Structure formats: C-alpha cells, structure tokens
Design a protein with these regions (language model features):
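Bacterial N-terminal signal peptides
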Residues: 1-10
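The substrate-binding groove and active-site-proximal loops of carbohydrate-active enzymes
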Residues: 34-44, 67-81, 121-140, 217-234, ...
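Short, acidic/polar
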Residues: 42-56, 139-143, 264-275, 328-335, ...
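Polysaccharide-binding and catalytic clefts of secreted carbohydrate-active enzymes
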Residues: 121-291, 295-298
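Carbohydrate-binding surfaces of carbohydrate-active enzymes
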Residues: 280-501
C-alpha cells in the first residue's frame, strides 16, 4: 500500500494510545453452535505465553479478561476466583496489562431478582432488568469484591451495560454462551418486568401492550422510546459510578454496538452524555470497524459516536471481531482511514483477527497520528423518525430505516465531512459549541427537531438537504480536517495522505 509521509507526532497529535485484545473462557461457550465454536477457537486460547508474546510484538498492551457473575458465584456467597487468578497471572507474566470485561448483568441460577421480561410472550430473559434497584446492589457487591481481591493489578475496566454483549440496550437473541437466555429476541418490548411496568405507570396511563402493538399516539410512542433509552443510559452511568468508586485508579471503557439505536433499546449519544456526567475518564468504543466494508458507510456509525464523545468530553475508541478487516488490503485501507478520520484513541481487535493480517497491517494501527476532526457541518441523525419506526414495528427485527440513513449519509460523506447530531444534542448546545454553520437534513425534519433548530436559524445558521454541496471529486478522495493536519484517503489507490493545515 502506498503511504503518504506522516509528518506530525506532537503531544497533541499522538498515535492510538491503547491497543486491546480479549479472552473468553472456553467454559462459557456453547460450542455446539457454529458461532460458539468459532469464538472458542479464536478467543479461548489466546493467553498462552506464545500468543501473548505475539500480541505484545504487534503493539497490543492490554488483555481484557471476561468475568461473568454467572460463573463467579454459582453458589450464593461463594466466589470462585480460580480461573481469573490463573488468567490474570498469565497476562502479567506475558508483560501486558490486565483489563476486565465485567459481565455482572448475567446472574447465576440461584438469583431471584428481576430480569428483562418481554411483553409479547410474557417470558423472562437471563439478563438483569435495569429498572430493578437490586441490579445496582449487585454491581456494588461484585465490583467491590473484585477490586478487593485484585486491586491495582487491574488497569482497565469495561463497564457493563444491560444487553447481551454488555452493551446498552435490550436482549438480542445471543445463543452461543452457556448462560444465554432460552427466550431471547430482538424487539423493544423488553419492559414487562414489574419494576419497568411500575416506572411506566408513573408517567403514562397507556398500557404497554397498546404501545408495543403500535396503537399508541405519536406523543406516547415518543415517550416510550425516551422511557427505555433514558433508563438504559442512566443504568450504564450508575454502574460506571460504582466501578469508578471501586477502581479509582483504572481506565474505563464501554461498548456501544448494533446498527440501529432505538430498535436496539438505547440512544448512543444519551449513553455518552450520562457517562460523562459521572466522569470523562472513559472511552466509548464503537464495536464494528469497517462493518459495511466501505469507509463512507462504515464511518457513519463511528462518526455518530465520535461526535457525541467530542461534544460531551470523553474519548472515542473502536473495535472489531472481523477476521478479514485488517487482513485484506483494501478492507484494511478503508478501516484504517475510519480510525484516522475519527481520532480513535483506543483500538480493540481479537488475536485471530490480528494474526491473519500481514506484518504491515499488524503494526500500522499504532503509527497513524491522532488528532480530533474539525468541521462546521452537521448531519441530523433522524432520532424522532427512528423512534416512531421502532414503535411501529416493535416486534420486528428489520433495520431498514437505519440502512436508509447509512446509505444517504455515506453518499454525502463523499461530498463533505460532517458531525452527526440528534435532537437532544442540539438542545444541549451542540451546534453552537462545535461551531456548526450548516446543518444537513437527509430526511424531512420533524417538528420536535425543528423546534430545537430555531435558535440555530436565528443565529444565521443554514439548514439544507445537502444538494448545495459540491459533487464528489473524481477520482474520489475522502478529506478530513483535523486540529493538527489534514488527512485524505483515496480508495482507488489505497493511499492515506497527511498534509499540513
């Protein structure tokens, strides 16, 4: 691959600060399922001495060890630390830092607290309900016990959310773990437990069954989405506060995934906002680098998260579990520029994925300069439309609305760089703080968002559909202005260039 000269490595424009990988215990995985067997093969044997030596040579500095409450306390009041003791010692002996991927939202069989319960089938999941106050008591107790045992040996803590992968949101039908829920599916009707129902009854007289059947009025539909997304965000922040109290010296992270937001049970920007109200010492990681195998579309999700991170004040990171992303040269170029364009501070990749890459791609992640993007254009994330779409098809698994947004935003990225903001971010002052002069609406603007744009228009801000921007250059070159330099990516040649501002 042709590479332009990297000329700036100042205190401001540093390469990616941290490179992480992870380990999943074999005893957690249901290898009778093909995806489970793949996870076991790729992730359960990566902390043996030879593999740790490989990762250290590739620039990895931290190994995240998965710790699941389901396995840690199978007998009430009796913690089994044997496996984690062994794994921590292995990572330390390999000269890498120890991180924890804390899945304390998956209870052991004896636990009698509330879990998510779907309304459509009146069936529980095996994931703690964030509406149940006892869920925070669990976090307090298990984080406390873990910190007491390992202390400063733990350098990094990946804070739990409420979804299957420890992300914010609702269950999503994961089947490849031994603790996976027998009943699980993607929908927004996971508000059927008694605490969620009681919380909803305090703000609405409309039965939840009416809402998830798509029969509620517009105001109630929007209220319902705010109801569950707000709880998801606040739960993450409350758990983060507990983890910080127990591990005050540590670095922290939280994963955000799934292409859709409200259909998945949360709002990315709101999660970031609530976390930053606790502390900005956290890296929020988008979990699908290069997921569309094309920079213009894949970067939409990364920039959505990065925009909120820049605005609310925390660091941005990315991760992937795709074996080919950094192995195939063309995909590597697209994924690499996604990291550059979004000033990625922390990168995560699995051992097997890094191993499949050539030597150049293994090391290049730590070579790119990192500097925050600077932009005066913002694309509206159609959060109101996504809410209404989610409620209209509450028990559907389709993400067509999200796909339409990604397609349109991806096409517009060929013409201009941009931030991505939603109605809440505008209300919080995003456009003014980030120096936005032009807002691009790729869909009709709903009245709720139009109301928040009134001040922007009054200050002379321009709102357009994007057609007034110059057409894409030929040949296509993506351009990002950073605080310290300008970066460009030419997909036809694979060249990533850096220029002085």
């Amino acid at each position: 691959m042709a590479m332009g000269m990297i000329f700036v490595l100042t205190a401001v424009a540093q390469p990616i600060a941290h490179y992480h990988s992870r380990h999943i215990p074999a005893e957690h995985i249901n290898d009778a399922i093909p995806f489970g067997l793949m996870c076991k093969t790729n992730l359960s044997y990566c902390i043996e001495p030879d593999k740790l030596a490989d990762m250290k040579s590739w620039g990895v500095d931290t190994i995240e060890l998965r710790l699941v409450w389901w396995a840690l306390e199978k007998e009430k009041g009796v913690f089994d630390w044997l496996r984690l003791d062994r794994d921590v010692a292995k990572v330390e002996a390999g000269g890498l830092k120890v991180g924890l991927f804390t899945w304390f939202h998956i209870p052991p069989a004896w636990y009698e607290g509330e879990t998510f319960r779907c309304i459509a089938h009146n069936q529980p999941s095996r994931t703690l309900s964030p509406w149940d106050p006892a869920a925070l008591d669990v976090a307090e107790r298990i984080y406390g016990a873990t910190a007491a045992r390992y202390g400063r040996r733990i350098d990094f803590v990946y804070v739990i959310g409420s979804a299957d992968y420890g992300e914010p949101g609702f269950p999503h039908a994961v089947k490849h773990y031994k603790f996976s829920s027998p009943h699980s599916h993607k929908s927004i009707d996971w508000t059927g437990d008694r605490y969620a129902r009681a919380a909803w009854a305090k703000i609405s007289d409309v039965p939840l069954e009416t809402v998830i059947a798509g029969k509620a009025d517009r105001a109630t539909a929007l209220k319902y989405c705010d109801f569950y997304s707000d709880r998801s965000a606040r739960y993450c922040a409350e758990v983060f506060a507990i983890a910080r109290k127990k591990f005050p010296w540590a670095r922290f992270g939280l994963p955000v995934g799934h292409h859709s937001e409200y259909p998945s049970g949360y709002n990315r920007a709101e999660v970031i906002k609530r976390l930053c109200e606790v502390s900005t010492n956290i890296t929020v990681r988008w979990t699908d680098i290069g997921g569309f195998r094309d920079f213009s579309q894949s970067s939409v999700f990364a920039r959505r998260v990065e925009s909120a991170c820049q605005f609310y004040g925390c660091a941005f990171g990315e991760e992937t579990s795709h074996p080919l992303i950094f192995g195939e040269e063309n995909l590597s170029n697209h994924a690499s520029y996604e990291l550059v364009a979004n000033a990625t501070e922390m990168l995560h990749n699995d051992y097997s994925c890094i191993r499949t890459a050539g030597d150049r791609n293994r090391l290049r992640m730590r070579e790119f300069p990192r500097s925050a993007p600077v932009c005066d254009v913002a694309v509206l994330f159609p959060d109101i439309d996504e809410k209404l779409s989610a409620v209209a098809r509450a028990t559907s698994t389709g993400d067509r609305f999200t796909e339409d947004f990604v397609r349109k935003a991806g096409e517009f990225r060929k013409r201009s760089d941009y931030w991505i903001c939603d109605t809440m971010m505008i209300k919080d002052g995003f456009l003014e703080k980030m120096g936005v002069k032009k807002v691009v609406a790729l869909f009709p603007i709903p009245p709720e968002t139009e109301k928040e744009l009134a001040g922007f228009r009054a200050r002379g801000g321009v709102v357009s559909d994007g057609d007034d921007f110059p057409p894409p250059p030929d040949p296509l070159v993506y351009r990002t202005v950073h605080r310290d330099f300008i970066s460009e990516f030419c997909p036809s040649t694979g060249e990533i260039r850096f220029k002085r501002r």
